[in-house]
Amino acid sequence: MARPFFRRRKTCPFSAKNAPKIDYKDTRLLQGFMSERGKIVPSRITAVSAKKQRELAKAIKRARHIGLLPYIVK
């Protein structure tokens, strides 16, 4: 008989009390939510809530537009 699958309870890293604010100028924080190729990692992998994922995507796109982050990494 196979082991039952237990889902790990995921909590949003931006919903905690001392959580960092999402800011387009904080490239080190934003790069943690991007793949090594420069793509935005989905929230089902990073455990970010839907609201914060939208804010995160907007901040990454804004940072890309003004040249702080690359669109694609070769």
UniProtKB/Swiss-Prot annotation:
Cross-referenced SUPFAM superfamilies, in alphabetical order? Ribosomal protein S18
* Classification via PROSITE patterns: RIBOSOMAL_S18
Tell me yes or no: is Ribosomal protein among this UniProt entry's keywords.
yes
Q: Which Gene3D superfamilies match?
A: Ribosomal protein S18
Which GO molecular-function terms appear in the entry?
Answer: small ribosomal subunit rRNA binding; structural constituent of ribosome
Q: What does this protein do?
A: Binds as a heterodimer with protein bS6 to the central domain of the 16S rRNA, where it helps stabilize the platform of the 30S subunit.
How does this protein assemble?
Part of the 30S ribosomal subunit. Forms a tight heterodimer with protein bS6.
The entry assigns this protein to a family as follows:
Belongs to the bacterial ribosomal protein bS18 family.
For this entry, the protein name equals: Small ribosomal subunit protein bS18
Task: State the species of origin.
Answer: Erythrobacter litoralis (strain HTCC2594)
Record lineage: Bacteria, Pseudomonadati, Pseudomonadota, Alphaproteobacteria, Sphingomonadales
State the encoding gene. rpsR
